[in-house]
């Protein structure tokens, strides 16, 4: 059968650390993230299969590397996630273990989808973008979950235990609650189970 369960994210940890699995340029579209061809979109109800095509137009080794990495981060330039509002463009990276995207800027709708699937979207400046490389180890030094709950905007990231930079989270109170829960699906599930008595 070609239908699988939608992935439900885990509640956000205090720590986010992982390898930069892919460094991308400006204007990466949702079509780059999940190609919109019929032979691929036929799997849109099977996230395990669909995720195999994640970012294949940028790097066809990405999905396999991400699955074996046990978590990681993406780095991008300006306007990450522009184009159509395809939820799968956030759902598939989440399934592959992506915990954060560090980008110079985000397309608004895709950024909302990153929140909805529990992926932390952090804005970085051009200098940080130029300096960070694919394969680097990135740690969000700030205790992530408590900082999000407290409404913090600035987060310190450490790269290769060598240098640090500041990244910024621009999020509403509702988006912060969704992130903390591990995504909209888990938040909704928690709310329903909590109200069920």
Description of each model-found segment:
Residues 1-197:
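Fe-S-dependent hydro-lyases/dehydratases of central metabolism
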């Amino acid at each position: 059968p070609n239908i699988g369960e939608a992935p439900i994210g885990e509640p956000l940890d205090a720590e986010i650390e992982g390898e930069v699995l892919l460094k991308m340029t400006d204007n990466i579209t949702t079509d780059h993230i999940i190609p919109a061809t019929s032979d691929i979109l036929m799997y849109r109800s099977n996230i395990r299969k669909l995720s195999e095509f994640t970012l294949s137009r940028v790097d066809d080794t990405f999905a396999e590397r991400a699955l074996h990495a046990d978590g990681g981060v993406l780095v991008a330039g300006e306007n990450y996630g522009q184009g159509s509002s395809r939820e799968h463009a956030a759902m598939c990276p989440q399934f592959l273990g992506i915990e954060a995207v560090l980008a110079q800027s985000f397309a608004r709708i895709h950024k909302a989808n990153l929140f909805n699937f529990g992926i932390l979207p952090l804005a970085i400046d051009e200098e940080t973008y130029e300096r960070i490389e694919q394969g680097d180890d990135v740690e969000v030094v700030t205790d992530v979950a408590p900082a999000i709950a407290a409404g913090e905007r600035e987060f310190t990231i450490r790269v290769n235990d060598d240098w640090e930079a500041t990244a910024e989270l621009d999020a509403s109170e509702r988006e912060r609650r969704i992130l903390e829960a591990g995504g909209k699906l888990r938040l909704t599930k928690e709310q329903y189970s909590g109200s069920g008595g």
